């Protein structure tokens, strides 16, 4: 029987773009759900705002 995978694909969405009415940028990445149980927050580049902003994991 195959083992259950620990890595899952997640989507990161910009938090500041919604406040300003711009289209939110989204990034796709993977995370290990055994080591990182809480939601991931990274600082990534948003091309519509032309600056680095916080991106939070969405479902």
UniProtKB/Swiss-Prot annotation:
A matching Pfam family: Ribosomal_L33
GO terms (BP aspect): translation
GO CC, alphabetical: cytoplasm; ribonucleoprotein complex; ribosome
InterPro entries xref list: Ribosomal_bL33, Ribosomal_bL33_sf, Ribosomal_zn-bd
Keywords: Ribonucleoprotein, Ribosomal protein
Gene Ontology MF, one: structural constituent of ribosome
SUPFAM superfamilies per the UniProt record, alphabetical: Zn-binding ribosomal proteins (SSF57829)
Similarity comment: Belongs to the bacterial ribosomal protein bL33 family.
PANTHER family cross-referenced by the UniProt entry: 50S RIBOSOMAL PROTEIN L33, CHLOROPLASTIC (PTHR43168), LARGE RIBOSOMAL SUBUNIT PROTEIN BL33C (PTHR43168:SF2)
Name the UniProt record assigns to this protein: Large ribosomal subunit protein bL33
Species whose genome carries this gene: Prosthecochloris aestuarii (strain DSM 271 / SK 413)
